[in-house]
């Protein structure tokens, strides 16, 4: 069941309708003819059942919003604190807890393990034809590195060198 566009809409609804909200919703960050939105989000976590094409959660559920843009995250955080609830697919959902994970960037070389909370989609498009890749395809690593570098440049986030390897 696909609900990602609903969650994306919920996140955008937390932004003000002024220049800031307009920037995040309509403009985004640019680099080399590419446009990047400033955030990503996870799937919904929690126990649920599907009834009439709707997710029915048995208890609490949660999801993650992630961004390099602190201003974006602070705006989302303040809006949630003020409202104490979200409107998700015409359902009022009470917020019980909100936390900010302070993941500091690091300098130098460091081995880290990244687990994606949502599937990665790796593809290239040429002449209106898209080619999709599996993480095990040798081209995937270059696409991932280039994507990270392009996003860092679009966000004006400094990187000197990006060493990246996929272990299976």
Language-model-detected regions and their locations in the chain:
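RNA-interacting cores
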Residues: 1-168
């Amino acid at each position: 069941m696909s609900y990602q566009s609903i969650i994306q809409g919920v996140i955008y609804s937390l932004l003000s309708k002024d220049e800031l909200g307009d920037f995040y919703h309509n403009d985004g960050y640019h680099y080399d003819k590419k446009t990047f939105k400033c955030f990503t989000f996870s799937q919904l976590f929690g126990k649920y059942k599907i009834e009439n094409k709707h997710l029915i959660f048995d208890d609490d559920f949660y999801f993650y919003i992630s961004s390099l843009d602190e201003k974006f995250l602070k705006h989302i955080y303040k809006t949630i604190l003020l409202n104490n609830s979200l409107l998700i697919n015409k359902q009022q959902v009470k917020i019980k807890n909100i936390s900010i994970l302070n993941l500091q960037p690091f300098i130098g070389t460091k081995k880290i393990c990244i687990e994606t909370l949502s599937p990665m989609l790796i593809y290239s498009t040429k002449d209106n034809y898209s080619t999709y890749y599996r993480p095990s395809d040798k081209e995937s690593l270059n696409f991932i590195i280039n994507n990270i570098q392009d996003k860092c440049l679009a966000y004006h986030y400094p990187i000197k060198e990006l060493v990246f390897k996929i272990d299976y």
